[in-house]
């Protein structure tokens, strides 16, 4: 089922003008295009690249888990739980998606003992491969955020120049392509059913026969049309509150904030594939590795495990259909994510207010 990021990038890398092409808009960052141009020109198959980044991702997760926990038995069990008991690794490998690799870099930066400059360099590299990861960077504190932003700017500029594309117009074209994404749509119900975000469900509800021509249907359509604004508004308000309270200091160990931002990116991003929930590996590791008790830690671990869980696993013994399987699993994962989101909002907003 090889139709993910790597197959698209293999095509884009063959274009002479990937960002100024009038007939084609694409939102991939220039560093990715540049890397794939060199990779394809070397005569290598994209499948090799796909396998490499996924194996390397596991090495990053294992080495940082071992470094943080100093317990090889725990690190091995944690890695096996994540790979074997969840679908993210296998389906990411099947799709040829780079998101798993980006999450592993984020995991490595958090739990491997690195200097500020080393963290900023790795985070800049991650943003240069997947810009959406930027919403998590403020959690590292104002200093790392500032250094990372400067380095990322230079990486983007140099990459555009290397591709012989105009920097400003190419960047605007990339942002416009990213903001005009139309997923999910009625033209592909399989994608709609596998969407973990709340928007796919709103889109489906809006097109029910009893609702489609009603005023409620128009209301749902207006919400759906402004989904990007709603998502970024929630992120902006969240970071404004937490940064003002922390005074720019690092919030790396704030497990409830990690859960909230992760679930926000899953439920409120325009389209969330089945592998996007893999970001919850970060708060899961904090919860399982902490030597101090964390409020509601058992509940949080249980809910994350339910999101990861392969619900239709027993069907594999008789009849395996990847699309039906994903549809069942993604709906279960969406339902648990929504419950978890309600729980975490209650804990970090209402309970904090009552305590204050």
Per-range role (PLM):
Residues 141-153, 294-301:
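Membrane-interfacial entry segments at the cytosolic side of transmembrane helices
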């Amino acid at each position: 089922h090889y139709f993910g990021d790597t197959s698209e990038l293999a095509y884009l890398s063959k274009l002479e003008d990937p960002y100024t092409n009038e007939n084609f808009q694409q939102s991939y960052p220039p560093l990715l295009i540049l890397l794939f141009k060199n990779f394809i020109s070397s005569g290598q198959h994209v499948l090799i690249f796909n396998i490499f980044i996924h194996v390397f991702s596991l090495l990053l997760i294992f080495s940082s888990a071992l470094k943080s926990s100093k317990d090889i038995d725990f690190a091995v069990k944690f890695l096996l739980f994540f790979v074997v008991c969840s679908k993210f690794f296998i389906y990411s490998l099947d799709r040829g998606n780079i998101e798993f690799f980006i999450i592993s870099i984020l995991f490595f930066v958090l739990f491997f003992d690195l200097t500020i400059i080393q963290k900023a360099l790795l985070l800049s590299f991650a943003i240069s491969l997947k810009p959406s990861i930027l919403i998590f960077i403020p959690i590292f504190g104002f200093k790392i955020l500032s250094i990372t932003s400067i380095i990322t700017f230079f990486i983007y500029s140099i990459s555009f120049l290397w591709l012989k594309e105009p920097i400003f117009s190419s960047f605007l074209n990339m942002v416009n392509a990213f903001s005009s994404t139309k997923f999910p749509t009625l033209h592909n119900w399989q994608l709609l059913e596998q969407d973990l975000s709340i928007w796919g469900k709103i889109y489906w509800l809006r097109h029910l026969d009893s609702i489609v021509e009603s005023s409620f249907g128009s209301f749902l359509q207006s919400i759906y049309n402004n989904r990007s604004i709603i998502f970024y508004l929630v992120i902006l308000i969240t970071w404004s509150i937490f940064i003002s309270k922390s005074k720019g200091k690092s919030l790396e160990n704030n497990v409830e904030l990690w859960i909230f931002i992760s679930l926000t990116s899953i439920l409120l991003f325009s389209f969330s594939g089945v592998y996007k929930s893999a970001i919850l590996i970060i708060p899961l590791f904090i919860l399982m590795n902490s030597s101090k008790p964390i409020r509601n830690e058992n509940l949080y671990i249980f809910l994350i495990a339910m999101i990861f869980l392969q619900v239709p696993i027993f069907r594999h013994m008789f009849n395996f259909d990847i699309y039906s399987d994903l549809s069942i699993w993604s709906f279960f994962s969406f339902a648990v994510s929504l419950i978890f989101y309600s729980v975490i909002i209650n804990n970090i907003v209402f309970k904090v207010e009552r305590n204050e």
